[in-house]
Swiss-Prot record:
Gene symbol of the encoding locus: efp
Localization in the cell: Cytoplasm
Biological processes per GO annotation: peptide biosynthetic process
Molecular functions (GO terms): translation elongation factor activity
Stated role: Involved in peptide bond synthesis. Stimulates efficient translation and peptide-bond synthesis on native or reconstituted 70S ribosomes in vitro. Probably functions indirectly by altering the affinity of the ribosome for aminoacyl-tRNA, thus increasing their reactivity as acceptors for peptidyl transferase.
Pathway annotation from the record: Protein biosynthesis; polypeptide chain elongation
Organism superkingdom: Bacteria
Name the record gives this protein: Elongation factor P
Length: 187
């Protein structure tokens, strides 16, 4: 199915020249003279490279043959991440470059979406919100009551996020994996 220029948005998956891409950033430009166009940064699912591409009015791109499968993250064994299909129990391995930034949010046993392109695993998407335990953060000090103040906190996966001063080591918090921002404590 063809995708028109007006349908482009961040996160959309497209195919150009037989290669699947994800739109990382886009900007709709209306110059004083001439036709409007979209300037986009797109990231290849196959090699991870980001390129800049300009789409003009009337340009079309194809929707890639991508299938999302729910899988369980099992473990990381040095150079590969192991996943198991929760329906067939088949296991697959993905490299560090294929997993990318998702690795800092993954816990053993977590369900993730593995993206398949022509039946080959190429990428992993974690849930937009995850609950993780804080393993290290600075202690509270009397007087740290400003809600605008933040401190770094290391999570059980190794990711570091900024949290309010009232959040303590050992607590479980919810984090937005796209913006890498603290959302709230888990009750």
């Amino acid at each position: 199915m063809a995708i028109g220029m007006s349908e482009l948005k961040k996160g959309l998956k497209i195919e150009l020249g037989g290669v699947p891409y994800r739109i990382v950033e886009y900007q709709h430009v209306k110059p004083g003279k001439g036709a409007a166009f979209v300037r986009a940064k797109i990231k290849s699912f196959l090699d991870g490279k980001v390129i800049e591409k300009t789409f003009h009015a009337g340009d079309k791109c194809e929707e890639p043959n991508l299938v999302e499968k729910t899988m369980q993250y099992l473990y990381h064994d040095g150079d590969a991440y192991q996943f198991m299909d929760i329906e067939s129990y088949e296991q697959i391995a993905l490299s560090d470059s294929q997993v990318g930034e998702a690795s800092k949010w993954m816990l053993d046993g977590m369900q993730v979406q593995v993206l398949l392109y022509n039946d080959k695993a190429i990428s992993v998407d974690v849930p937009q919100v995850v609950a993780l335990k804080i393993v290290e953060t600075a202690p509270n000090f009397k007087g740290d009551t400003s809600s605008a103040s933040k401190k770094p906190a290391t999570l059980e996966t190794g990711a570091v996020v900024q949290v309010p001063f009232h959040v303590l080591e050992g607590e479980i918090i919810k984090v937005n994996t796209e913006t890498e921002e603290y959302l709230e404590k888990v009750k």
